[in-house]
UniProtKB/Swiss-Prot annotation:
CDD domains in the record: RNaseZ_ZiPD-like_MBL-fold
Cofactor(s), by name: Zn(2+)
Similarity field: Belongs to the RNase Z family.
Name of the coding gene: rnz
Protein name: Ribonuclease Z
Subunit text: Homodimer.
A GO molecular function held by the record: 3'-tRNA processing endoribonuclease activity
Keyword presence, Phosphoprotein: no
Length: 306
């Protein structure tokens, strides 16, 4: 089970209703952050998520509402005597910005910080991959994909019998090794299991205008978190942001399972935004508020930590 915890769902500046962007992915005892706007540390405290469990932070771009919470997080980790390394990823200039950021106060982290600048990259970890892709925001900016590894299918009794075998202790050995020899014949795991189960796929656009790369990287995602700062093109003007209609168009074309409309402009009250979005968007969507949680497995569940 993967949990997507919306720590901040607004854009541009914090309001009484919502904080600026930060999303926590809770998976296998690890916490990954997508963006870390100012006040994220307080949001983590509200949700009882431990900052010490954060392993990786992926920053989409260097506008303040997406990264200004980083300093307070690093300082708190140091006060709590963290020793484990922290990995920070971002677009071009990430190394320069983070290095300058860390020189802006009279403290030094108690742990190593590894900084990685990404283009369109695929990062492989034990149980999942994270892909980065370029978006259109007028400055170096990235979107991210979390792709859980596919899981092997269940043992198929019919396939086992067709090979003249019976279920037994050998199955555990095969599961560990991937192949074993039985009665002089080499048996592979895929010979006796069903179709692999697709791993969960989540996409986060960060700030962007509508662009084709989002559609390409989002195809058949379980969840697309698409910025939808404005309700209309008139409100949007010439900014490098998206409207609700544009986010819905992309989700429909990419055939995603669920769309989350994200990064609402401060001018909109939640009720107003929901009312207008329901008129505009014909696709299956949610409008998360701060502390909402989406749990993804074979189906999704929506709840709140408020």
């Amino acid at each position: 089970m993967l949990e997507v915890i919306f720590l901040g769902t607004g854009g541009i500046m914090p309001t009484k209703e919502r904080n600026v962007p930060a999303i926590a992915l809770k998976y296998g005892g690890e916490i990954i952050l997508w963006d870390i706007g100012e006040g994220t540390l307080r949001q983590l405290d509200t949700t009882k998520l431990s900052p010490m469990k954060i392993e990786k932070i992926f920053i989409t771009h260097f506008h303040g509402d997406h990264y200004l919470g980083l300093m307070s997080l690093i300082q708190t980790m140091t006060l709590w005597k963290r020793e484990r390394p922290l990995y920070i990823y971002g677009p071009k200039y990430t190394f320069e910005f983070i290095q300058n950021y860390l020189k802006s106060g009279f403290f030094r982290p108690s742990f190593e910080i590894h900084i990685h600048e990404l283009g369109e990259t695929r990062l492989k970890f034990k149980d999942y991959e994270i892909w980065s892709f370029k978006v259109d925001h007028g400055i170096p900016a990235l979107g991210y994909v979390f792709k859980e590894n596919d899981k092997r299918g269940n043992f198929d009794v019919e396939k086992i019998r067709e090979l003249g075998l019976k279920p037994g202790p050998w199955m555990k050995k095969l599961e560990i090794k991937g192949k074993i020899e039985i009665n002089g014949k080499l048996i592979y795991l895929e010979d006796v299991t069903g179709e692999p189960k697709k791993g969960v796929k989540i996409v986060y656009t960060g700030d962007t205008e509508q662009c084709e790369r989002i559609k390409l990287f989002s195809e058949r995602a379980d969840l697309l978190i698409h910025e939808a700062t404005y309700l209309s093109r008139e409100d949007k003007g010439d900014s490098y942001h998206s409207t609700v209609e544009e986010a819905c168009e992309t989700a429909k074309r990419a055939k995603v399972e669920l769309l989350a409309l994200f990064h609402r402009a401060p001018r909109y009250k939640y009720e107003e935004y929901v009312q207008e979005a329901n008129k505009i968007c014909e696709y299956k969507f949610i409008i998360p508020q701060d502390f909402d949680v989406v749990r993804l497995g074979e189906k999704y569940e929506l709840s709140s930590l408020r």
